């Protein structure tokens, strides 16, 4: 699912909302999650999951094209940990109908 499909879904589930309002709502949620992560905060959405920022230390790696050693700088990366409800639903769906296109 891409962002525009999510906006369309929110608009369809809430017929009193115009598509533009649904888009603004989705943008506001995503902007706030991003802002919280930028501030180093943990975003915990009950029964859905948790967004956190993790530190990746600097390390050496290899260029896959030529095998030369390269230095990879440290960085901060977003990480999502799915909540129990999502994990349970995915595992129930897997048992009943397979994983679809995974």
Swiss-Prot record:
Parts of the chain that traverse the membrane: none
Highest taxon, organism lineage: Bacteria
Keywords for the protein's UniProt record, in alphabetical order: DNA recombination, DNA-binding, Plasmid, Transcription, Transcription regulation, Translation regulation
Gene Ontology process terms (BP): DNA recombination; regulation of DNA-templated transcription; regulation of translation
InterPro entries: Hist_DNA-bd (IPR000119), Histone-like_DNA-bd_CS (IPR020816), IHF-like_DNA-bd_dom_sf (IPR010992), IHF_beta (IPR005685)
Keyword DNA-binding appears in the UniProt entry: yes
GO MF annotation: an example: DNA binding
Bridged cysteine pairs (disulfide): none
Family annotation (CDD domains): IHF_B (cd13836)
UniProt xrefs under Gene3D superfamilies: IHF-like DNA-binding proteins
One GO CC term on file: chromosome
Family: Belongs to the bacterial histone-like protein family.
Subunit structure: Heterodimer of an alpha and a beta chain.
UniProt-listed HAMAP family: IHF_beta
Role of this protein: This protein is one of the two subunits of integration host factor, a specific DNA-binding protein that functions in genetic recombination as well as in transcriptional and translational control.
UniProt name for this protein: Integration host factor subunit beta
Gene transcribed to yield this protein: ihfB
């Amino acid at each position: 699912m891409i962002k525009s499909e999510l906006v369309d879904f929110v608009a369809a589930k809430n017929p009193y909302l115009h598509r533009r309002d649904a888009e603004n709502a989705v943008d506001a949620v995503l902007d706030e999650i991003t802002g919280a992560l930028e501030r180093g905060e943990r975003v915990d959405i009950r029964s859905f999951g948790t967004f956190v920022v993790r530190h990746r230390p600097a390390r050496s790696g290899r260029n896959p094209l030529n095998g030369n050693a390269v230095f990879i700088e440290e960085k901060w990366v977003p990480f999502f940990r799915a909540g129990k409800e999502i994990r349970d639903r995915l595992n129930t769906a897997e048992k009943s109908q397979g994983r679809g296109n995974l």
